């Protein structure tokens, strides 16, 4: 016998739209060519962000940024490998990816 779920428990919002900044696309190509970083794990984080309306779980160390990056969030893909993103309404925009020194040194 199968249990029936009420209709309200089956409803969900559609996934967010996504976009990426030119700087993110350049970072992606550079990091993919280097072979030093787990791009599949980065893609996993991106898909979770697109599919959910909430910040990532604690294992991603997802947090808001301050200063010049005040309207952005950062998550740790692995070690010092980071993803910087922001939301604009129902759209998530991937801004940069790389290490702390690559992203925050002037």
Predicted segments with their positions:
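Basic, Lys/Arg-enriched alpha-helical interface segments
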Residues: 1-79, 87-93, 101-106
């Amino acid at each position: 016998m199968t249990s029936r779920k009420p209709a309200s428990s089956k409803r969900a919002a559609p996934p967010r739209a996504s976009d990426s900044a030119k700087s993110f696309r350049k970072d992606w190509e550079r990091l993919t060519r280097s072979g030093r970083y787990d791009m599949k794990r980065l893609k996993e984080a991106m898909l979770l962000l697109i599919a959910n309306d909430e910040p990532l779980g604690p294992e991603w160390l997802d947090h808001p940024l301050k200063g010049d990056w005040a309207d952005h969030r950062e998550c740790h893909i692995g070690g010092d490998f980071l993803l910087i993103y922001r939301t604009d309404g129902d759209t998530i925009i991937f801004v940069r990816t790389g290490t702390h020194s690559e992203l925050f040194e002037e």
